């Protein structure tokens, strides 16, 4: 274990090594990062979280620092869908400036309080500046997040037009070089697999079931006997099965997992949606063409089905269910009818090579996630300008140092955008502060970024700062770092 200044320095070194690899991807003139793979061609990407997840440092203590910032990137991606590189850049700036002051004798606890105070004020400002989105704004946000690719921006805007802003958009690889949209019937609800052993795609930790039977149980299931016939049928016909239940007995779940691992049973068990459970279950039953599986009704009489089901750690998506919802939708309120009637837009991504396909999928995924964040909370001026215009709270003592650390860190995103474009960061930042204009790094012009369509989702801008400040505060107040005991090699 290590203590005091040495502990913080080693953590900082790890933060810097990871952040330096990630931040080269920021902005319209950001660079690619080439990542070695275990098998096949290297992965080329501008996706910050992909880069962050690929960095491993030999020094254990430095790697702990890198892991802390890696978590910032991952959490920002999970919370807001984008902004992973911005969060990393902000975290690095706060850590470096903060540790200078801690080393000089400032109280780290008071510095952290000042940082938290500043972040609270800034996030309220970001919320107040947010503009609701329309389809033109959606296209602009998607274009910027896709590394300023207007074709991808238009593609995603078209997808949302087809299924509305409350609809579902997913992505798959095309069988050709063309990239196109297909709208199918389906729905999505918040839930996840009950065990990671159900995962079939370890690249994105998802479970994909082709042409599965769907069984919906609005109750706890605890007796394997009532499902034996269906499970045997699935095993014999090599058919997948998706089970949705309110609760599952641990022994029953273990039995299904063992059959999944040892016997290749294509099964996944998910918990019923928590939010508006009864409504959502009714919709699932209608879409899949099944019935509720009760203790009185034989399970085989209750099965529905769909063309495909995708289960991630956050959502379950059912595509092209076997049910006919035409009459069912007529009796629903507008919100539910829109959710079911809108369907699912699938973007099939095509490219000329596997390397190009992987890079393009990264950019489209970023664009979809950023667009969803913009729909949630609106948009603000991009290019780092919203951070520079944010007001700061008054503070005294070492808390004032914390506020000033955040003030300086707020320059970091625009500074990095400029450096990636080999532009004079100090001059550009000074002019943005002096005027009401922002800097468009793509055209290298000062202009009204809202009118120019240079927009960032407010949710991304807010979440990136909150997560960066949170982990930076932890590093500043760290006094000891302990590494795991090394297991002796046999």
What are these regions (language model features)?
Residues 1-39:
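N-terminal, positively charged regions that mediate nucleic acid binding
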Residues 3, 9-11, 56-63, 261, ...:
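Extended, low-charge hydrophobic alpha-helical regions
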Residues 11, 27, 81, 105, ...:
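Residue-level signature of catalytic and energy-coupling elements of molecular machines
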Residues 22-32, 74-91, 148-173, 376-390, ...:
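Conserved phosphate/anionic-ligand binding catalytic regions in large, soluble enzymes, centered on
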Residues 41-77, 194-206, 211, 217-229:
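Glycine-rich oxoanion-binding loops at beta->alpha junctions
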Residues 42, 89-96, 120-123, 127, ...:
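Core structural elements
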Residues 123-377, 381, 481-490:
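Long, structured protein-protein interaction/assembly regions in large complexes
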């Amino acid at each position: 274990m290590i203590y005091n200044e040495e502990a913080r320095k080693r953590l900082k070194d790890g933060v810097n090594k990871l952040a330096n690899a990630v931040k080269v991807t920021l902005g319209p003139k950001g660079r690619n990062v080439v990542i070695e793979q275990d098998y096949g061609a290297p992965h080329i990407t501008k996706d910050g979280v992909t880069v962050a997840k690929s960095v491993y440092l030999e020094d254990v203590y430095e790697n702990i620092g890198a892991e802390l910032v890696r978590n910032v990137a991952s959490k920002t991606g999970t919370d807001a869908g984008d902004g992973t590189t911005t969060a990393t850049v902000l975290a690095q700036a706060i850590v470096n400036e903060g540790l200078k002051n801690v080393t000089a004798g400032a109280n780290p606890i008071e510095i952290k309080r000042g940082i938290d105070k500043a972040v609270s004020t800034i996030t309220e400002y970001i919320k107040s500046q947010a503009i609701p989105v329309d389809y033109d704004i959606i296209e602009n946000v998607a274009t910027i997040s896709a590394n300023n690719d207007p074709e991808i921006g238009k593609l995603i805007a078209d997808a949302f037009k087809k299924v509305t802003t409350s609809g579902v958009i997913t992505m798959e690889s095309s069988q050709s070089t063309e990239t196109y949209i297909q709208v199918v019937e389906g729905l999505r609800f918040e839930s996840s697999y009950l065990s990671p052993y159900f995962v079939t795609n370890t690249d994105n930790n998802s479970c994909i079931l082709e042409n599965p039977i769907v069984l919906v149980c609005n109750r706890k299931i605890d007796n394997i006997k009532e499902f034996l016939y269906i499970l045997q049928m699935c095993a014999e016909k090599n058919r997948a099965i998706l089970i949705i239940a309110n609760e599952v007995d641990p022994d029953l779940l273990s039995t299904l997992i063992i059959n999944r691992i040892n016997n290749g049973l294509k099964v996944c068990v998910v918990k019923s949606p928590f939010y508006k459970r009864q409504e959502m279950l009714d919709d699932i039953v209608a879409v899949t063409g099944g019935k509720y599986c009760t203790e009185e009704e034989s399970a085989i009489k209750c099965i529905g089905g769909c063309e495909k089901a995708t289960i991630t750690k956050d959502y379950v998506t059912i595509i092209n269910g076997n049910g006919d919802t035409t009459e069912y939708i007529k009796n629903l309120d507008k919100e539910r009818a829109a959710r079911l009637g809108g369907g699912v837009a699938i973007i099939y991504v095509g490219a000329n090579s596997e390397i190009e396909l992987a890079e393009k999928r990264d950019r489209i995924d970023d664009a979809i996630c950023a667009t969803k964040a913009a729909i949630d909370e609106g948009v603000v001026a991009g290019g780092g300008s919203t951070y520079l215009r944010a007001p700061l709270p008054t503070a005294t003592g070492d808390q004032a140092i914390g506020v000033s650390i955040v003030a300086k860190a707020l320059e970091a995103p625009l500074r990095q955008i400029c450096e990636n474009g080999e532009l004079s960061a100090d001059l550009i930042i000074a002019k943005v502060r002096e005027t009401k204009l922002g800097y468009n790094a793509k055209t290298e012009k000062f202009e009204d970024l809202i009118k120019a369509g240079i927009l960032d989702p407010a949710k991304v801008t807010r979440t990136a700062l909150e997560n960066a400040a949170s982990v930076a505060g932890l590093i500043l107040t760290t006094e000891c770092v302990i590494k795991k005991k090394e297991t002796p090699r046999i």
